């Protein structure tokens, strides 16, 4: 009789625990949904509050962490180059993006979104410091984004303006353009662990366009890669294709917080196509081998 009673109470206790866990999960999903709507309205601070609450309620749930990192990134991307925080503060904030992504991967190694935002955090820290000063981090960025791509990315915003699968193609395309191709020679590639590849950059950016043809940033980045490759390897048809893209994207609807900046930068690139290879939304990058050698002396 006692054993039966014990079993009964254990069953009731287990059922109660499961019910609480299910209620918490529902609550967290609701909080994440609220944070998503606030993110879509560029209300990043309010979105953060919902995510913080979700982290407390469901501490083993990975999703709120990559979303928190995304909020930091997009908040910073909304600033024009001349209006961003000081370099030291930028680096600190991008390290926060990476920290949130690391927590995300700890909770779910197979969530590709965690790896996508880990790469973003490291990558933006690198462009803030300068690509040539950050080459030691390049393979970490590449590895994170390749892993994200291989794991598969399912996130797509409700309004269709953000798609993680398109985003990782965009990110890798940008990576293979900004990291210099001269690193591909021995022994530099062996030291750094990776190198640029402009053909691969164009391939990834075309994939991003195929995935989301109306995204202003996808169009701009394809044009930038075409301009860079076209000038470097004397491909005038690529330069003309790029110029047409930069003109045409001006008529695309602005749906993301940084779209206005990207349209301005498209006009800037049309005015001076020599900027293409080292172009980044946050900061123009020095890429030359001479600058790299001088910096090492």
What kind of region is each of these model predictions?
Residues 1-10:
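Bacterial N-terminal signal peptides that target proteins for export
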Residues 9-17:
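Bacterial N-terminal signal peptides
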Residues 19-63, 78, 239-242, 246, ...:
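Extreme N-terminal leader/anchor segments
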Residues 33, 67, 74, 117, ...:
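"A position-specific structural signal for the A-helix of alpha-solenoid helical repeats
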Residues 38-49, 70-110, 117-166, 171-207, ...:
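Short coil/linker segments at helix-helix boundaries
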Residues 64, 114, 166-168, 218:
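TPR alpha-solenoid repeat register
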Residues 161-168, 260, 264, 271, ...:
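Extended ligand-binding clefts on enzyme/binding-domain cores
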Residues 208, 217-225:
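Extended serine/threonine-enriched, polar tracts that run as long, contiguous segments within proteins
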